[in-house]
Amino acid sequence: MFISVIVPVYNVEKYLDKCLESLLNQHYSDMEIVVVDDKSTDGSLNIAKKYEKHTNVKVVAKEKNSGLSDTRNVGIKESCGQYIMFLDSDDYVENGCIAKIQGIIEKENAPDIIYFGYYEEYESTDKQ
């Protein structure tokens, strides 16, 4: 089953490589990564464009900043997967995540939505 992962981007040059690398390192090949830049003013778009060399990565550069909801909607319009996953550009997925999602879809007889947990990672060591 084909999965589209939509990554909305706005001024996240510090995190974007880790996000996209985590998707490209998945052991699941039947997916596309749709990166939608919401008119970033930092180097985010340039970082995203270097991933276009991968055949399953599509980068869309919006002409006007219009917020997260519109950026996700553009990603939906540009995607072609049977399932859509949103991954914020300052987040990343663990190895095997997409394959686990595919397994859940098959096991649970094609659910309409899947929600899964997350870990919080802090840059500062004084955060509890």
Indicate residue ranges for each PLM-predicted region.
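Nucleotide-sugar donor-binding/catalytic module of glycosyltransferases
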Residues: 1-128
